[in-house]
Every structure is written in C-alpha cells, then in structure tokens.
Amino acid sequence: MNMLGSMFSMVKPRLDDLGTDRLNYYYSTLIIMGMSLTITARQYVGSPLQCWVPAQFTKAWEQYAEDYCFVYNTYWVKPNDKVPLTVEERVSQQLIYYQWAPFIMAIEAAFFYLPVIFWSMLSTKSGINIIKLVETAQKAEGAESEERKKQIDIICRHISNNLRKRRNEEETTKMAKIQRIFGMQHGKYITNVYLVTKLIYMTNSFLQFYSTNKFLGQNDPYWGMRILDDILKGTDWEHSGNFPRIAMCDFQVRVLGNLQRYSIQCVLTLNMFNEKIFLFLYIWFLLVFFVTLFDSIFLCYNMFSSHKLVEFLQQFLDNQDQDENDEKKPEERKVYRKEQHSILLSEFCLHKFTPDIIILLKMINNHTGDIVCTEIVGRMWNEFLERDAKLVLQRFVDNDHHMETKSSSLKSEKLFEEQRSFI
C-alpha cells in the first residue's frame, strides 16, 4: 500500500510528451494502480472468500479453513461434474491468480511508467532542456507584449545556440558513445531516443497483454472477447468457467494424532471484481498498443518526409503577422515571397532545423498551441532572411550557372564528336 501511495504521488503529467505518451505513462499507470488498490482493499479489509464448512467446525476452525484456502489456492469443478478423485487432477484445475492479482497489477503499473524514466534520463543529455523551454513557452503564452517578446527570444536563442553547438562541438563526456549511437552530432539524438521510447511503450503493452493471458491460465488470445460475448449473451460462469465464483478447497487437519482431509466449498467474491477488471485490462492493453503503433507511424511519416516537414513549418509562417522587419523591407520581402520563396523555404526547413528542433517545436505546440510556435518560427524565419537569404540565393544562382555551363560544354563536345564522325 505504501509503495502504491508513493507511486501515485510520483506519477504526474510531463511537459516533454506528445500524442499517446500520456496514455501510456500517466493514464495507464494511474488506472492500473487504482484497480490494484481496489482489489487490495477488498482482500485485506473485507473477506476475500467465504467457505461452507462442516457443522462441527468452531469459529476458529472456520477462519483457519478460509485463510488456508485463500493462501493455498482453490480449484474449480463444474456444478454437474464429480469432484476429481486424484490430487493431480485437482491441482490441474487450480485457480492460482486471485490472491496475486493486486501485486501483478502493481507490477504492471510500474512497467507502464518505466519507459518515461528511460526517456527522462536520456533526453536530458541532449543539451536541449525540453521541459524548461516548454515552461518558457507557457509563460510567453499568457504574458504581456514585452515579457512575451523576452520569453520568445530566450527560446529562439536556445535553439540557435544548439544548432551552432551541434555543428562545432565534438562530444567528450561519458555519454559520448550513447550520444553517437543516437545521432547527437547530427541533431537526431532526441528524435531517436524518443522513437526508441515509443518502441518500448509498444513492447510493454504487448508483453503486458501476453503475460496477463499466461497469468490467468488462458491459452487463447481471444479469451477477452469470449468473456465479453458471454456477458452480453448472459452466459453464466458456471458453464464457461471464466472467473468462477464458487470453487473447492482441500485441506488437512491433525485430530488426535491423525490427519483428517476435508473438501469444502468456497465463494470467491473477488472474482466478481477480477472478471470486470481483467476484461477491461485485456481491451485496454490492445487499445494502447494499436493507438501507440499508429501514432508512431504517423510521427515517423511527419518527421522523415520532407514534404510534411515543410508543411509543418509552413503553417506557422502562413499564420505569422507582418512584423517590423517586414515593414522595413517590403520590396525585398515581396520578391522573396513571390520568386524565391520555395528556394528559401526549402533551405530554411530542411537545413536550418534538425529533427531534434522539430520534436521540440511539436512539444511546444502540443502544450501551448499554434500562437507561440508561430512567433518562434516567424522570428527564426526573419533572422534567416536577414542573415542567410542572399547567400542562399547566390549559391543557387551559381549552381544554376554552373549547370548551364556544364550543359553547354557537353553540347559542344557532342557536336564536335559528331563532326569528327562525319569527317
């Protein structure tokens, strides 16, 4: 109980998440911990099972029998079937899950939270303080004009410094090997760590689904659908055997030096809760897995498609208002927008933004909305036009001229060869 209480206080929404992350590390963890606490309270505050004992049993004997049966398992027999004669047959039909259910759920909740710990530990080594920058963006969202400009400047300066650092710095820390593996020097460290975290989320939900099936002794991966179908059709557990409410229990007591064996019938009130809880978890694990899978595919498409990358940044440039920089150079701005806009936009999006910066912008956009991101991208666009636009356009003209010269040279050589051939 203390462990679950401390986990409840530790699990909080984070500012460095996207899409389905919160569904995994936050909502799943809290939901499963809540279920674990519910079953724990039912087990240790109420009566987990009650047994029908022989009339000669005293109150102490009855309590002993119920405690023994709760600890050492029960076995299920269909109402119209005979009780198995051999111990081996009875053991093969044992119900071994109900007393362990709250502990298994606590472990499941912990495993849903582990991936975000992995993400938190490695993402902080990138040089980009994502949480701090998102907090700054949130301050800018609700600030007045001057304070807003100041907060936006802080974010833009941090991004620019990170871009310069990635180009010029050779990593020499203890994390250097891990950072190289995850693409630190190419501005892909956060992106790769984040995608690995997504993979861990999916692996976790799939393994949770598989291990829960094994824990319940179900060899059919569709058992959840069968139970749901039984509930909807009104099929009684007495016929299906799913989470039986009544089970048998065998125990021995020593009376006057002799061992006497008793077989008693017990009511498993816990299984009323277990049936609904594990059916919910069956559906939940599948839902989380597929939602995370589709979200990861969608993210990869948006991150590694040049078209979607340009489209992502273009939406903010389209939203931005004309600032003082536009008013100072209206003619130049107009030329850029009409004639060379595609060249500059392509250079700006594909070469001035690393995947890590794109992930950062997506997280800022996720927690603050379009307005702050519009100002950040707009500010960086205007700085790009001031500092790099002429150089980019000149390089494009030079390359174009070089290609024309090369094409003319090839044509001349071809004509010369044709003339030689004719002669």
From Swiss-Prot:
<comment type="subunit">
    <text>Heterooligomer of eat-5 and another innexin.</text>
</comment>
<dbReference type="GO" id="GO:0005921">
    <property type="term" value="C:gap junction"/>
</dbReference>
<dbReference type="GO" id="GO:0005886">
    <property type="term" value="C:plasma membrane"/>
</dbReference>
<keyword id="KW-1003">Cell membrane</keyword>
<dbReference type="Pfam" id="PF00876">
    <property type="entry name" value="Innexin"/>
</dbReference>
<keyword id="KW-1133">Transmembrane helix</keyword>
<comment type="function">
    <text>Structural component of the gap junctions. Required for synchronized pharyngeal muscle contractions.</text>
</comment>
<feature type="transmembrane region" description="Helical">
    <location>
        <begin position="25"/>
        <end position="41"/>
    </location>
</feature>
<keyword id="KW-0303">Gap junction</keyword>
<feature type="transmembrane region" description="Helical">
    <location>
        <begin position="277"/>
        <end position="297"/>
    </location>
</feature>
<dbReference type="GO" id="GO:0055077">
    <property type="term" value="F:gap junction hemi-channel activity"/>
</dbReference>
<keyword id="KW-0472">Membrane</keyword>
<feature type="transmembrane region" description="Helical">
    <location>
        <begin position="341"/>
        <end position="361"/>
    </location>
</feature>
<dbReference type="GO" id="GO:0005243">
    <property type="term" value="F:gap junction channel activity"/>
</dbReference>
<keyword id="KW-0407">Ion channel</keyword>
<keyword id="KW-0406">Ion transport</keyword>
<keyword id="KW-0965">Cell junction</keyword>
<keyword id="KW-0812">Transmembrane</keyword>
<protein>
    <recommendedName>
        <fullName>Innexin eat-5</fullName>
    </recommendedName>
</protein>
<feature type="transmembrane region" description="Helical">
    <location>
        <begin position="102"/>
        <end position="122"/>
    </location>
</feature>
<keyword id="KW-0813">Transport</keyword>
<dbReference type="InterPro" id="IPR000990">
    <property type="entry name" value="Innexin"/>
</dbReference>
<comment type="similarity">
    <text>Belongs to the pannexin family.</text>
</comment>
<dbReference type="GO" id="GO:0034220">
    <property type="term" value="P:monoatomic ion transmembrane transport"/>
</dbReference>
